Swiss-Prot record:
It is an enzyme of class 2 (transferase). This is Adenylate kinase. Its EC number is 2.7.4.3. It is found in: Cytoplasm. Catalyzes the reversible transfer of the terminal phosphate group between ATP and AMP. Plays an important role in cellular energy homeostasis and in adenine nucleotide metabolism. It catalyses: AMP + ATP = 2 ADP. Signal peptide: none annotated. Keywords: ATP-binding, Cytoplasm, Kinase, Nucleotide biosynthesis, Nucleotide-binding, Transferase. Pathway: Purine metabolism; AMP biosynthesis via salvage pathway; AMP from ADP: step 1/1. Residues 30-59 are annotated as: NMP. Residues 125-164 are annotated as: LID. Its main location: cytoplasm. Belongs to the adenylate kinase family.
């Protein structure tokens, strides 16, 4: 099973990705991690990517896509969920073309929808548990509100990421994501428009539901009961 997942920052995309990974035993692959791994290992693609990153420039698609495909084929032999790529319509088209050439089948595309202002509020309200950063805490979401100043799961210390409070940075990220002409949503919709032709199932889920409600919907749409995961 091979899956692309889309959702704005603040939608809980990462949390749902981890839950899907555990339920299906597939590999959760994040584009940012791929860059870091290639750079730390000193691969040829990693060296090329680093030369752009060090200059504060975007890594070209002709470096990024081979890097991602290589990771999918090596780490995702039993299935994968790709998170964080593609980010725009051009990348979607190039990724699709590359997957066709390599014979890589895309089975599902997940889009978690969330109004922009709600997504922004959630980012600002996010709190990170120092003991375990997989423990969800958010002052803007009733179902996962912290226990005062402590983690709702383990009562550990909570911290606030400075970039979560930078409204200008949040707005820039969301400008890219919510752009339906050339941005990340246009990439998601590119695959949606091809879903019938390539037998790819497109799943739309309401990100304003609780983590458990979203999980239940996704697992059922992906073909298993949430009771057995």
């Amino acid at each position: 099973m091979n899956i692309l997942i889309f959702g704005p920052n603040g939608s809980g995309k990462g949390t749902q990705g981890e839950l899907i990974q555990k339920a299906f035993g597939i590999t959760h692959i994040e584009s940012g991690v791929i860059f870091r791994e290639h750079i730390s290992k000193g691969t040829e693609l990693g060296k090329q990517a680093k030369s752009y990153i060090d200059k504060g420039e975007l890594v070209p698609d002709d470096i990024t896509i081979p890097m991602i495909l290589e990771t999918l084929q090596i780490k995702g032999k039993s299935g994968w969920l790709l998170d964080g790529f593609p980010r725009n319509i051009t990348q979607a088209q190039k990724l699709h073309e590359a997957m066709l050439k390599k014979g890589v089948k895309l089975d599902y595309v997940i889009e978690i929808t969330l109004p922009r202002e709600v997504a922004k509020s959630r980012i600002i309200g996010r709190r990170i548990c120092k003991t375990n950063n997989n423990h969800p805490n958010n002052v803007s979401i009733d179902s996962i509100k912290p226990d005062g100043n402590n983690c709702r799961v383990c009562h550990g210390e909570l911290i606030v990421r400075t970039d979560d409070q930078d409204e200008e940075a949040i707005n820039k990220r969301h400008d890219i994501y919510y752009n339906t002409k050339t941005g990340t949503l246009s990439a998601a919709h590119y695959f949606k428009n091809l879903s019938d032709q390539y037998e790819t199932h497109y799943i739309l889920v309401n990100g304003q539901n609780t983590i458990e409600e979203i999980r239940k919907t996704l697992l059922e749409d992906l073909g298993i009961s949430s009771e057995v995961s």
